[in-house]
UniProtKB/Swiss-Prot annotation:
Its EC number is 2.1.2.10. The glycine cleavage system catalyzes the degradation of glycine. Keywords: Aminotransferase, Transferase. The glycine cleavage system is composed of four proteins: P, T, L and H. One of its GO terms (biological process) is glycine decarboxylation via glycine cleavage system. One of its GO terms (cellular component) is cytosol. Pfam families: GCV_T, GCV_T_C. Belongs to the GcvT family. It comes from the Bacteria. This is Aminomethyltransferase. It is an enzyme of class 2 (transferase). InterPro entries: GCS_T, GCS_T_bac, GCST_C, GCV_T_N, GcvT/YgfZ/DmdA, GcvT/YgfZ_C, TrmE/GcvT_dom1.
Length: 362
């Protein structure tokens, strides 16, 4: 067993009272005392997450654009100015999901952020796709990344970066602001406003302390999961993986079908799937009574078929259980979940469940 890796913020987590756990081979904070309280802080104020375990890859070379247009399902040609970002799946030729990621246009090429647990697989896959392209990849382990999220996140970051306040406030969602080795992006994984900020690793702890002094609470991975689930956001390895099509995982919106001549990996398989009719779809499930919907539980849709819960939890905001599920495409507004041998009625809803701290489904 190799020892788990540590982010540049490890000592700051310990000092803040974090309970550390192994997550994708990294020692990460699961909470700092109360997962529930941390969840509520992000919904009502501002919290910060260490996401330095995720992998930042800088992409350069004359063919970087053409290579990315083959590698991912969304189209980097949409990125019209430096700092603009898009979300995409990286697909196999069979049209299943290798990983989900964000790509930013930069002055030198592109910057990609991929998941921690898939990094080695992703890099091997990307290297295998480079033949015939003038493209180079550089993994930026010299950077740390902090996500500052919540209704007061922008205000509190601006209070410690007053010289950038105007530029930060001007950022729209999925836009980034490069500042030397620092990079501020108006992105997140919580369903709240906020920033994901890349900083040189040796400046990460001092920035963490500045944020603490500005009233930004550290938040663990436990609350990160309940927040993203309320926001209806996928988690790789749970809601989609290399056995699942993006069309069956709520990722259809991330596929750029035009221009028709762009031959991205998996395109033919997805077109065939669309032509034949997609068999499964992703939905939200709501259980307003007792019980908790958990990953792996069977979903039964009368006279239609069966599906499965891919992520489930008790929602701290809604005070009842919610889940993301993959169910037969013909599923309507009602289904049942097998809770300890009892088929229990659940509502089928369109996600997200929560946006900006408020319930948004019907």
């Amino acid at each position: 067993m190799t020892a788990p890796k540590r982010t540049p913020l490890f000592d700051a987590h310990i000092a803040a009272g974090a309970k550390m756990v192994d997550f994708a081979g990294w020692e990460m904070p699961i909470h700092y005392g109360s997962q529930l309280k941390e969840h509520e802080i992000v919904r009502s104020d501002a919290g910060m997450f260490d996401v330095s375990h995720m992998t930042v890859i800088d992409i350069t070379g004359a063919d970087a654009k053409a290579w990315l247009q083959k590698l991912i399902a969304n189209d980097v040609a949409k990125l019209g100015f430096e700092g603009k970002a898009l979300y995409s799946g990286m697909l196999t030729p069979e049209g299943t999901v290798v990983d989900d990621l964000i790509v930013y246009l930069t002055a030198y090429g592109y910057r990609m952020v991929v998941n921690a647990g898939t990094t080695e697989k992703d890099l091997a896959w990307m290297e295998s796709q480079k033949a015939g392209f003038d493209v180079a990849l550089k993994v930026r382990r010299d950077l740390a990344m902090l996500a500052v999220q919540g209704p007061k996140a922008i205000q509190k970051v601006c209070s410690i970066k007053p010289e950038l306040a105007e530029a930060i406030r001007a950022l729209k969602v999925f836009q980034g602001l490069p500042q030397g080795e620092w990079f501020y992006a108006r992105t997140g994984y919580t369903g709240e406003d906020g920033l994901e900020i890349m900083v040189p690793a040796d400046q990460a702890i001092s920035f963490f302390h500045q944020l603490q002094a500005a009233g930004v609470s550290p938040i663990g991975l436990g609350a990160r999961d309940t927040l993203r689930l309320e926001a209806g956001m996928n988690l790789y390895g749970h809601d989609m993986d290399e056995t699942v099509s993006p069309l069956e995982a709520g990722m259809g919106w991330t596929i750029a079908w035009e221009p028709a001549e762009r031959k991205f990996n998996g395109r033919e398989a997805l077109e065939a799937q669309k032509a034949a009719g997609v068999k499964m779809k992703q939905v939200g499930l709501v259980l307003e009574g007792r019980g908790v919907l958990r990953e792996g539980l069977k979903v039964v849709v009368e006279s239609v078929g069966e599906g499965v819960i891919t992520s489930g939890t008790f929602s701290p905001t809604l005070k009842h259980s919610i889940a993301i599920a993959r169910v037969p495409a013909a599923t309507g507004a009602a289904a049942q979940v097998d809770l300890r041998g009892t088929l229990t009625d659940v509502r089928v809803v369109k996600m997200p469940f929560v946006r900006n701290g408020k319930k948004v489904f019907e």
